[in-house]
UniProtKB/Swiss-Prot annotation:
This is Pantothenate synthetase. (R)-pantoate binds at residues 61, 155. The lineage of its organism: Bacteria, Pseudomonadati, Pseudomonadota, Gammaproteobacteria, Aeromonadales. The active site is at residue 37. HAMAP family: PanC (MF_00158). It is an enzyme of class 6 (ligase). It catalyses: (R)-pantoate + beta-alanine + ATP = (R)-pantothenate + AMP + diphosphate + H(+). InterPro entries: Cyt_trans-like, Pantoate_ligase, Pantoate_ligase_C, Rossmann-like_a/b/a_fold. Its EC number is 6.3.2.1. The gene is panC.
C-alpha cells in the first residue's frame, strides 16, 4: 500500500493507473477509523480496480476550534487497518498542503439550499467546508466512483447534488450505516463516550425507531412526535440538539406529495454529539 502526502505523488500514481486502463474508487475520511469506514472500503472494492482513501482532518468544516483540536489523530493505526482492508493508496495531506494560503483566502464551494438547512443551520460553514474539501479531493484523485456513508444523510445528499450540478463524472455510492449489536450507529465520536454513556447511547436509535413505528402506524402529526422524542431522549440523559422529520428527497418540510420521510437525529451525550437517521416510506391509499 502506498502512503503519499503530496499532490504530485498522488497524481503520478493515479496517472499510471489511468494509462493502464484501471478504474479508481475513492473513500475520503478524517481518520480515527472504525468498522463503518472499512465497510466503505469493502464496498469500494466492488466498484473499481483500485481503491484510494484519504485521511485529512479538515479544519474548514469544524465550527468550533476546540472540536478540531480534540479530534483524534490515529494515523499509524488507520494505515494499518487500511492496508489489511486492501487499500491501494492512502493520501494523507496536511492543512498546509490543502490550504497553502490559509482558510480565509481559499476558494470555496457551497451548495445552495442544502448547506443552510437542518444540520447546516446548526453548524454554519460546516457544509461549505465539506463541499470544498471533497471537490478538491475529487480533483486530485479523479475517481470513477466515491463511497460515502448513509449515516451522514445530509452530507450524502449535498455531495450528490454538488456532483450533479457541477457535471463531475463520478458515481456516488451511498453505503448503509454500520451499527453495533445494540443498534448504536458506529462513529468516531463514540470514542468520547464514557462506559456509562456508552450503555445509554443506543437509546438514540431506539427513539428514532419509535418515531418510525408511529409514522408507519399512521401518526403523521410530526411536531408532536418530535416533542415526544425529545422528551424521551432528555429523560434518558441526552441533551437533544435537533430532531427533524422531513422529505427524504428534498430535506425540506414534508408535503402531501412526499413519498418518503427521513428522521434526522442529533443529540449530545456527555461530550459526544451523536447523529443517526432512518428513512420511512409512507403508505399511500
Amino acid at each position: 500500500m502506498l502512503v503519499v502526502n503530496n499532490p504530485a505523488a498522488l497524481r503520478e500514481q493515479i496517472g499510471q493507473w489511468r494509462r493502464e486502463g484501471l478504474t479508481i474508487a475513492f473513500v475520503p475520511t478524517m481518520g480515527n477509523l472504525h468498522q463503518g469506514h472499512l465497510t466503505l472500503v469493502k464496498e469500494a472494492h466492488h466498484h473499481a480496480d483500485k481503491v484510494v482513501t484519504s485521511i485529512f482532518v479538515n479544519p474548514m468544516q469544524f465550527d468550533k476550534a476546540e472540536d478540531l483540536a480534540n479530534y483524534p489523530r490515529t494515523l499509524e493505526q488507520d494505515c494499518a487497518a487500511l492496508e489489511t482492508a486492501g487499500v491501494d493508496m492512502v493520501f494523507t495531506p496536511t492543512p498546509e498542503i490543502m490550504y497553502p494560503q490559509g482558510l480565509a483566502s481559499h476558494t470555496f464551494v457551497e451548495v445552495p439550499g442544502l448547506s443552510g438547512l437542518l444540520e447546516g443551520a446548526l453548524r454554519p460553514g460546516h457544509f461549505r467546508g465539506v463541499s470544498t474539501v471533497v471537490t478538491k479531493l475529487f480533483n486530485l484523485v479523479q475517481p470513477d466512483v466515491a463511497c460515502f456513508g448513509q449515516k451522514d444523510y445530509q452530507q450524502l445528499a449535498l455531495i450528490r447534488k454538488m456532483v450533479a450540478d457541477m457535471a463531475m463524472p463520478i458515481q456516488i455510492v451511498g453505503v448503509p450505516t454500520v451499527r453495533a449489536e445494540d443498534g448504536l450507529a458506529l462513529s468516531s465520536r463514540n470514542g468520547y463516550l464514557t462506559t456509562a454513556e456508552r450503555a445509554l447511547a443506543p437509546e438514540l436509535a431506539r427513539t428514532m425507531n419509535w418515531i418510525a413505528e408511529q409514522i408507519e402506524a399512521g401518526d403523521h402529526h410530526l411536531p408532536s412526535l418530535v416533542a415526544q422524542a425529545s422528551q424521551r431522549l432528555d429523560k434518558a440523559g441526552f441533551r437533544t440538539d435537533a430532531i427533524d422529520i422531513v422529505d427524504a428527497a428534498t430535506l425540506e418540510a414534508a408535503t402531501d406529495q412526499s413519498e418518503q420521510l427521513v428522521i434526522l437525529m442529533a443529540a449530545y451525550l456527555g461530550k459526544a454529539r451523536l447523529i443517526d437517521n432512518r428513512v420511512v416510506t409512507l403508505a399511500r391509499s
